[in-house]
Amino acid sequence: MVLLAGTRPQGGEARCMIPPPPSPLLGAQVEEDRTEFKEFQDFSSLPDTRSVASDDSLYPFQDEEEHGVEGVESVPEEGILEAWGSCGRWCGVG
């Protein structure tokens, strides 16, 4: 046998969560000091917008000769084989 009490069909009084009154800090508009902020439409005009994760750090330079970077195509095949043989001898593989 189950004893149901209260005025609701589920029995017992249902708990009603009353929302707390709004906090004065949350409801009030905080006036910002506009002198601290500058708005920029063009971010390239900022003094330092580059980061370690910029495209330049992930991809080769567009102008390799300007930066002194040689592509794999410019290294002679003999040089690659010599380096491979040196590594193998140093590691005890060859």
Swiss-Prot record:
Instruction: Give the start-end ranges of region Disordered.
Output: 1-23
Protein name in the entry = Putative uncharacterized protein ENSP00000347057
Q: Give the originating organism.
A: Homo sapiens (Human)
Lineage runs: Eukaryota, Metazoa, Chordata, Craniata, Vertebrata
